[in-house]
Amino acid sequence: MSEIREQRISCELDFLKMFFEKFRNTPRSFESLKTDQKWLALYECLYESHLCVDCDTSLLFSIVKDDVIHYNGDVSNSPLFKLIKRLSDKGKLETNQPRLSEIDAEQLSSEDLTSIYLVANDVPEKQSTGNSFGVYVLPIESCLETDDYSKKTKRIQKNKGLEWSKLLKKAPITNSLIIMDRYIVTSEEDIKNNLLPIIDALIPNSLKIPFHLTLMTKVPTTDNIEVLYDSILSHIKESKPNVEVNLEIHNCTSGDFHDRAILSTNLYIACGSGFNLRRCDGSSQHGTTIKISHVGICQEAGEKIEWNAYFKNAFSIANRRASYPCKTNNRLFDSNQQ
């Protein structure tokens, strides 16, 4: 049974130093509450992740020691000590990892997928490198001063206009995507008005590595799965000519398959009534709520368990003989669990 791969986060040592210094040096007040909440959300993300740091162990431990000293030597009050100890105890801390400028296609195609790079300074070269590989580059100032990565809820009104490109405009860049919706290919109109616009909104305009796209749905007839495969790839080649896409379709025929969700390396989207919302005239055929979470950044533990269960369930009931191609290669899946 397939599982979603554990999220790996790469972090510059200078980011860690600045991140914990900012928390220590910010006077606690009513005005600081919003910043505190953002700091805590990212701290919880690091706490639950597999963290890769670009320095050796001795250098990392030296800044941990500085943090403990600030709290009068009491390790129970040092958030950095707690973080590093937890990750070390669980085998989820790696040092001497590549810097952002050193990432390459081989690394991003392996099991050691890094989805986020936390950097101390927002410089064009870092963003450019991240964009080339579909990696979300998050500078420290963005973590603490913007809401771009926070959890959002969008209310969709029946018969009102709906544009997927606008709704997903701020989605962080990615190199892998899973779309799970049993009904999104029910008709040609659903494919044209919903599936393809969603794909266009979430696939970058260019990448140095292949983009991995997995569609888990109910294909109207088994004979149509190859036709659907060819039509989706043909559309992507026209709309995103600078991106090579590895597409796979899993035909989930069971009536038990009902959950609808989209997952990328950093984004989780859930929609109560499904993603086949938009009519030909641009209006929504249902009233519903779309929940958008940047996984790992502002991710409640219960929700993470929920979406993992969605995808595991979908794979357990998929008719693998009707999957096209048959082998699952998406970076988001843990190959050791398949």
Question: For each of these PLM feature ranges, what is it?
Answer:
Residues 1-157, 196-338:
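PLD/PLD-like phosphodiesterase catalytic module centered on the HKD motif
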Residues 159-160, 165-170, 174-192, 200-204, ...:
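Amphipathic alpha-helical interface elements
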